[in-house]
């Protein structure tokens, strides 16, 4: 949204900065940081109040989880996704479809997690939604996003894979690009899901991933 302020610029004032992605990326970083500082405690306190005993602990996990994680509220992803969504809508360009694709995928997988956590609390067990259902929904979200990307891309690039570091290297995967992209999206989402529950929960891998993006 703030990107449009650059239209007020005469070329030599502060409004001109909003056209540069580096400036807006820095602004998004500090906005997310401020969002976390301002809302983390109120949201955590609200979750603790509503959930009382916290999330149900899995029986097949480490023994110390039963004592260390007891009373820990679930649904903390609301804070992470809220921070990401707020800073994105504030600093990103609305005319770029990739922004909306990323937001769609993030909200889609976030909704799966929210429903899963809600199911655990409602049924008072650690099972939540079955893994098969989560995986199937995740594949549909990833497939839709992949086809969306292909539709908006130049036909000569729509099935091509860029190789990091090597600027001019493009691997044309053909139709294999679709299952490959779906696998990467679903695999990335589930790697965070599998990491969640260990020390540090999901926030550290999410932070490390989002900082470089």
Language-model features: locations:
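"…together with the soluble PPM/PP2C metallo-phosphatase catalytic core" -> "…together
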Residues: 2-211
């Amino acid at each position: 949204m703030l990107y449009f302020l650059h239209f007020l610029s005469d070329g030599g004032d502060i409004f001109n900065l909003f056209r540069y992605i580096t400036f807006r990326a820095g602004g998004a970083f500090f906005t997310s940081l401020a969002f976390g500082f301002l809302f983390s405690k109120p949201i955590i306190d609200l979750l603790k109040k509503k959930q009382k005993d916290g999330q149900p602990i899995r029986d097949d996990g480490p023994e110390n989880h039963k004592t260390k994680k007891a009373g820990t509220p679930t649904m903390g992803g609301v804070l992470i996704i809220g921070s990401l969504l707020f800073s994105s809508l504030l600093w990103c360009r609305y005319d770029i479809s990739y922004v909306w694709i990323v937001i769609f995928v993030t909200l889609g997988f976030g909704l799966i997690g929210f429903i899963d956590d809600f199911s655990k609390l409602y049924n008072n067990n650690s099972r939540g939604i079955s893994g098969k259902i989560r995986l199937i929904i995740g594949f549909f979200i990833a497939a839709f996003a992949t086809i969306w990307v292909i539709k908006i891309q130049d036909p000569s690039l729509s099935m091509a894979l860029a190789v990091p570091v090597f600027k001019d290297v493009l691997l044309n995967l053909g139709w294999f690009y679709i299952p490959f992209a779906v696998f990467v999206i679903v695999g990335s989402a589930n790697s965070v899901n599998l990491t969640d529950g260990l020390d540090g929960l999901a926030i550290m891998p999410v932070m490390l991933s989002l900082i470089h993006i």
